[in-house]
Structures are given as structure tokens and as C-alpha cells.
């Protein structure tokens, strides 16, 4: 199934049903009076988080969604039927945004969570509602109110405990294959991974966590090189990042340079994401001699001034991966325990999470704006100058400019 994590749709709630104007007409009953019923309310539109979905592809080709209209009122004080609500199922981790105001309507982060995105219209009133002591036969009704209509953007971020970060061919997919049952494609060329992959790492019988593998970054990704940096949004909700570095790159490049490239691109996307807990994982240690391995590890650590955990592993040979998995599980458990018992720590993490979300949202919006400009033939907003010559389409030739003024 095709992986789609961003779509734009239009939703329309159902209009309310109109009120009915009717009078009681029955044998032997004179001046029966009004008996027009109210209309029914229009159906609303809801988003529902479904844990069985992992892509927004269903909304790529069906972009208009409308809830049912409320029925009109009837005679004998019959109220119209309420329109059926429309439930749109989306993957867990979907953010719903109003496309016109860029306001975040809500995040669907728990299975079964519901979010109303368009309110159904109110019902109209029948003429029975308007009878009074001075108006025994009212001929007044009200129409139903129109339902809300909204243009929405939906962005899906995978929900994972651990995120993998690194250059292409750093061994991210091989690592996730070695520690979980996930089987992402692995090959010896760049950008083998084109979409995020999730794997469940079982540490003990009752202990596990979810790990996310995203496409690799290259230098200049923040400016659109390679696959860009849009996929970094999937790391915004992770609890810890594993920074994978290839100790034995095929092109003979420096592992320290590769590590710096990733950190720079990460900072371009979200400076707050750099403050997330990050562990340095040096992969492919089995491909070089021990002396050279120690020298390269020392070079990377010193170049980055790294103070966090450092692991030297071989994902393909499963060397060091088990210890890393156990340490990750222990860290996640300690983190959850501290969140529950330390309010100051919980507040600090909540503030960091919000900063990451805000910066990621702003970065994605900037990328969308740039894409819109490119579609209109403008490379950037700086190319739009102050053009005061508003009528320069036809009269830019040399010579006097004549402006006709109507008396």
C-alpha cells in the first residue's frame, strides 16, 4: 500500500432541515391550528483515530466529504430526522489543521479518539413554534442553518518510542531488521528506504518498544536535496533518537563529517529537536580492524564533543544490538517513572515537546509556501519585488507614457 502522510481535503457538515408550515385539517375540527414540525439537525463530521491504519492514502483521491443533511419537518408536529454523522478514520498520530487559518484543530494520538472538525447545521423551526395568544394561525417558519465547511490539511506523524537518524546507507534499516521482526528493504545504494518503517522490539516477554526508521538525510537536505527533511517530522514525537554513523563508509569519507552533517540538518529543521535525548550509535564495526575502529570512534566523539551514551555495534552481525535494546528499554521505563513522580521534569519535557511541535509545524508550513511559490513560477518570496509599474504589460517600450483619464 502506498505511504501517504500529508493530504488536503474539504469537509462539509450537513445542513439543518427546514421547518414545516402546516395546519391541522380534520373533520369536525374547525380552526385546528398550526401543526408544522421542526426540521432535523444536520450531521457533523468527525475524525476518528484508528490503530489499524498507517497511511492517509484513502484521502489522496477522495478529497470531498459531506455529512448527511437533516430532513425537513412534517405535518402533525413531526420532527425531521437528524442527518447521520460522518466519521472519517485516520491513523493514530494524525494532526488536523485548518488550511485557511493554519490553526491546529487537534491531534489524534490515542486509538478511538474522536475530533469534531465540522458542526452540523441547526434545525429550522416549524410554524407551531410561533403560535401565541395573539397569533393563532402563524405562517412563519425558519430554514435550517447551513453546516460548517472547512478545508483541512492532515499530517500524519508515526508514533514511536525510538527514532533512527543517519545518512543513507548508515545501516538504519539493517539495524531495525536485526532488533525487530520488521523487514524493510535493504540494499547497497542510497535511499533504499523511501518511507518510514516501524518495528516492535521485544526485550523481555512483557516488555517492548516501537522503533521508527526514516529515510536518510544528506547534506543540503534542508534546502531540498535528496528526499528533503519533511520526513524528520516523524521524529518529533519520539522519546529518544539513535544517531547512527557508518564507521566504514564505502566512499572513504570521514564518519565525523557524516555525524556533523546530520546534526546540522537536524538543527535546520528544529533546533529544539537537537535537545531531545540522543544516543550515538557507531555501526559496521565488524568491517574494520580494532585499532582503526578505536581511532575512528575517538575522532567522532571528540569532533562532536559528545557527552551522551556511545555504542559501537554491528547491526548485520547483531553485535552489541541486544545490549543497546535492553538499555533503551531501561531508559524508557525510567523516563516514564520520572514523568509520573517528578512534576518539574514532566513540565520541562512538556515544554520541549511543544517547542518541537511548533518548530516542526512552522518548518513544514514554510516548505508548503515555497512549493506554492514554485508552482506559480516564483523561486522565493525575495524574487517578488516592489513593482509600482502596475500597467507595464504592454507599454514598456521607449517613448512617452500616455495615461487616459475619463472626465
Curated annotation (Swiss-Prot):
Residues 127-150, 378-407 are annotated as: Disordered. Its cofactor is Mg(2+). It is an enzyme of class 3 (hydrolase). Residues 129-143 have a biased composition (Polar residues). Belongs to the TRAFAC class OBG-HflX-like GTPase superfamily. OBG GTPase family. It comes from Pseudomonas entomophila (strain L48). This is GTPase Obg. Residues 1-159 form the Obg domain. One of its GO terms (biological process) is ribosome biogenesis. Its EC number is 3.6.5.-. The gene is obg.
